[in-house]
Amino acid sequence: ACSFSDETYHYYDIKKAPFKIEGLAWFSKEKEYFRLPKDCQQDVSEAVYWLASHPAGGQLHFQSNSKTIVIKVQLAASANMTHMTGVGQAGFDLYYKKRNEKNYHFFTSTNYPYGQVEYSIVLYRNDKKEWKDFLIHFPLYMGVKNVWLGLEKDALLKPARKRKKQGKVVVYGTSITQGGCATRPGMAYTNILSRQLDIEFIN
């Protein structure tokens, strides 16, 4: 069921089924956009805990036939990096593929006013209603409080199809592994490999 509506769209909380969040190892248990357990603060440094609040590698998967998809976001803070794009630090980007296709296609990213901590923007638009697999990448260097997706009121929504490869690939590394300084989230190398190999990566 949708969380709320306006004149055009039903908005859905992506933490709830049928949406599937991948890339965040503790999400299924804690329902937080966080890369470590929330109660690990006493076991790691302040810097590590802060970086864990950035959901780099987080991916949202689902199927829909909506002609338009709107994303509504509440961030932990505004984008502020001088060496990285605002969309790479604090934005989302969307990929799609048709049911008979193997590879994802990039559509667009959230090019919003980067001083804002809340925004709503059209992330996908199509002239005709057709079923597609959708993949949305999370920000690389910014905490995320809440995300809702707006779909057309007559659109249908289904769980993501199973990946060809089961299991997970865990990657540990430097700021480059987290995604610095990719221009947008989908260009972080772990996200590229996840799409190409069709397997979940834990960043």
Task: Pin down the residues of each PLM region.
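Short helix-loop-beta junction
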Residues: 190-202
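Catalytic nucleophile-elbow at a beta strand-turn-alpha helix junction centered on a G-D-S/GDSL motif
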Residues: 166-190
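N-terminal secretory targeting modules
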Residues: 1-168
